[in-house]
């Protein structure tokens, strides 16, 4: 597993506060999915950061950040 660089994440989502919310929201989604499958092998927070770095998920202006 390659370490996720914060500069890479900031280049994808420039606002550090929005980045934090996007990462935490995605990590919660992953945790719920993995908990349901009972296969939590890796930290959902790391998985969320990797997904953003690899551009598997993205945030755009106007996206809903509320739960």
From Swiss-Prot:
InterPro entries on file: DNA-dir_RNA_pol_omega (IPR003716), Pol_omega/Rpo6/RPB6 (IPR006110), RPB6/omega-like_sf (IPR036161)
GO biological process, one term: DNA-templated transcription initiation
GO MF annotation: an example: DNA binding
Enzyme class: transferase
Alphabetized UniProt keyword annotations: DNA-directed RNA polymerase, Nucleotidyltransferase, Transcription, Transferase
Entry EC number(s): 2.7.7.6
Catalytic activity: RNA(n) + a ribonucleoside 5'-triphosphate = RNA(n+1) + diphosphate
Gene3D superfamilies xref list: 3.90.940.10
GO terms under cellular component: cytosolic DNA-directed RNA polymerase complex
Family per record: Belongs to the RNA polymerase subunit omega family.
Function: Promotes RNA polymerase assembly. Latches the N- and C-terminal regions of the beta' subunit thereby facilitating its interaction with the beta and alpha subunits.
Subunit and partners: The RNAP catalytic core consists of 2 alpha, 1 beta, 1 beta' and 1 omega subunit. When a sigma factor is associated with the core the holoenzyme is formed, which can initiate transcription.
Name listed for the protein in its UniProt record: DNA-directed RNA polymerase subunit omega
Originating organism: Dictyoglomus turgidum (strain DSM 6724 / Z-1310)
The gene coding this protein: rpoZ
């Amino acid at each position: 597993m390659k370490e996720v660089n914060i500069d890479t994440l900031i280049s994808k989502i420039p606002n550090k506060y929005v980045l934090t919310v996007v990462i935490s929201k995605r990590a919660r989604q992953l945790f719920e999915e993995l908990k349901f499958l009972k296969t939590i092998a890796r930290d959902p927070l790391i998985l969320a950061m990797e997904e953003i770095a690899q551009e598997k998920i993205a945030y755009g202006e106007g996206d809903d950040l509320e739960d």
